[in-house]
């Protein structure tokens, strides 16, 4: 996947996920950023909704269906009250592609 292809995928993701008012930030992390041949894309969706993990994950997957036809997605909703830890530290190393 070329760098131009990756940029296009990130723009599509930001466009798809920015429609939901509860979404405050979208971060792409993991091997998609560093590999020339990524197998998937890890996406953290920071949001301030009171909904549970599963309904949010399903909604965001539905919104990003066009992107998933290009490359498989792993979407992780992250609540506004998320603390800290190794997983959030890994997300913090990623690239913010949208922020409200």
Feature-to-residue mapping (PLM):
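Catalytic core of pol beta-like nucleotidyltransferases
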Residues: 1-27, 33-38, 46-100
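Cell-envelope/extracellular polymer assembly enzymes that use nucleotide-activated donors
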Residues: 42
């Amino acid at each position: 996947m070329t760098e131009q292809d990756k940029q296009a995928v990130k723009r599509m993701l930001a466009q798809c996920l920015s429609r939901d008012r509860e979404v405050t930030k979208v971060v792409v992390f993991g091997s998609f950023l560093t590999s020339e041949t990524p197998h998937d894309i890890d996406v953290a969706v920071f949001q301030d909704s009171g909904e549970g993990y599963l309904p949010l994950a399903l909604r965001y997957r539905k919104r990003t269906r066009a992107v998933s036809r290009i490359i498989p997605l792993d979407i992780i909703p992250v609540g506004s009250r998320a603390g800290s830890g190794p997983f959030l530290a890994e997300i913090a190393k990623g690239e913010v592609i949208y922020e409200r």
